Amino acid sequence: MLTSLVGSEMCIRDSSNAITVSSVTSISMDPPSLLVCINKNSRIHNSLTVGSKFCINLLNKDQEDLSNICSDDDKYDQRFNDKNWNLDDVPFLANAQSNIFCSIENVTSFHTHSIIVGLVEDSKYKNEIKTLTYVDGEYS
């Protein structure tokens, strides 16, 4: 799974961030909300402020390479090279399985990570389900 984010001060491509996360959890349907945990040492962390926007992009099986790029700090500059990124506002991957657009409602610190609570504002999805999964250290 991949999340991309634009903080309140980040509106251009050079300020955009993307990171692969291993888990996104739904919290509630009323209001629709989810959480994601981000390591405090990651580059994206300091952009995660209340009121900023992000998008959870659930990847397709054929997007394993992009997932690996977004999890490798040595490939940081390659994260937005894919032609399917839409960078107009909150960056999202147009050909992902689904996109879940959120605004940050709460950020809670817990040891090495921050727990980010996002309120879902919009979503898009493909009808054909071919979602990339990561289980027991392997993609499937």
Residue ranges and their predicted role:
Residues 14-22, 99-102, 118:
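Short beta-strand/strand-turn micro-motif
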Residues 48, 84-88, 102-103:
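Short structured motifs
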Residues 68-97:
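Mid-chain, well-packed structural core segment of small domains
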